[in-house]
């Protein structure tokens, strides 16, 4: 059975003292010898703290974004090499909030994924449709377009990707795609990956739309849902640990 992956996305939340408490609780509560990979995507200023607090544990450190550039006059940006310096294993790319508030295009997201891979950081490529797009029957078209840009850019490195489906209408709204709705989109993404790779079944597909302690088990039971990209629930140790337990 494929190992599940649970990634907590803290977004722009946290503080030194609160982080220490949360990370300690996660380390102490993580099941020994569990069958799920776990990582936390923390704000960039806390990468060093997270790496230090989690040293020796099975919990990986993830970034929330990465630059498509290697270096240069890009004020405020962080390169993949910089992330590697802090022991970062994963980085989100193309999160809907980056696309919406920072104008990131499919092409930019694809370049970011490529930049991460080049430095040994695993990109978690986020795709998903808005409510208007879903109601217009465009879900499949939108997610396939977003993923196609990345597949084209990374070429033979496709098997090193992680993909997260995050229906934009279900992020932070309390609304969640039903397990059946989520599985339907995941199956579309799996088929798209299979057309580009003979090892598509090894590529982790995460669900990222308001997964919580109550719905995680049902979502994770779906055939093509290989884990979760967890937002608000990852800020509460008990809830996040419940989700991790559901993935075992």
Swiss-Prot record:
HAMAP family: TIM_B. Substrate binds at residues 9-11, 172, 210, 231-232. Keywords: Cytoplasm, Gluconeogenesis, Glycolysis, Isomerase. This is Triosephosphate isomerase. One of its GO terms (cellular component) is cytosol. InterPro entries: Aldolase_TIM, TIM_sf, TrioseP_Isoase_bac/euk, Triosephosphate_isomerase, Triosephosphate_isomerase_AS. Belongs to the triosephosphate isomerase family. The active site is at 95 (electrophile), 166 (proton acceptor). Pfam families: TIM (PF00121). Homodimer. It is found in: Cytoplasm. Involved in the gluconeogenesis. Catalyzes stereospecifically the conversion of dihydroxyacetone phosphate (DHAP) to D-glyceraldehyde-3-phosphate (G3P). The keyword Magnesium does not apply. Its EC number is 5.3.1.1. The keyword Cytoplasm applies. The gene is tpiA. It comes from the Bacteria. Its main location: cytoplasm. It comes from Delftia acidovorans (strain DSM 14801 / SPH-1). One of its GO terms (biological process) is gluconeogenesis.
């Amino acid at each position: 059975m494929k190992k599940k992956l649970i990634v907590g996305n803290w977004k722009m939340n946290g503080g030194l003292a609160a982080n220490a408490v949360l990370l300690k609780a996660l380390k102490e509560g993580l099941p020994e010898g569990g069958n799920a990979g776990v990582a936390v995507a923390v704000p960039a200023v806390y990468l060093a703290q997270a790496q230090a607090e989690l040293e020796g544990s099975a919990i990986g450190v993830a970034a929330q974004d990465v630059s498509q550039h290697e270096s240069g006059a890009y004020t405020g940006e962080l390169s993949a090499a910089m992330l590697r310096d802090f022991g970062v294993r994963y980085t989100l790319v193309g999160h809907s909030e980056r696309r919406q508030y920072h104008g990131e295009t499919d092409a930019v997201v694809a370049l970011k994924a490529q930049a991460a891979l080049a430095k040994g950081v695993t990109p978690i490529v986020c795709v998903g449709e808005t409510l208007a797009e879903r109601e217009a029957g465009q879900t499949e078209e939108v997610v396939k377009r977003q993923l196609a840009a990345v597949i084209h850019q990374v070429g033979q490195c496709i098997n090193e990707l992680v993909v997260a489906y995050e229906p934009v209408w279900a992020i932070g709204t309390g609304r969640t795609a039903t397990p059946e709705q989520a599985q339907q989109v995941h199956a579309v993404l799996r088929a798209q990956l299979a057309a580009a790779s003979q090892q598509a079944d090894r590529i982790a597909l995460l669900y990222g739309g308001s997964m919580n302690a109550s719905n995680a088990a049902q979502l994770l039971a779906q055939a093509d849902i290989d884990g979760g990209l967890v937002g608000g629930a990852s800020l509460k140790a008990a809830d996040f640990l419940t989700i991790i337990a559901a993935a075992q």
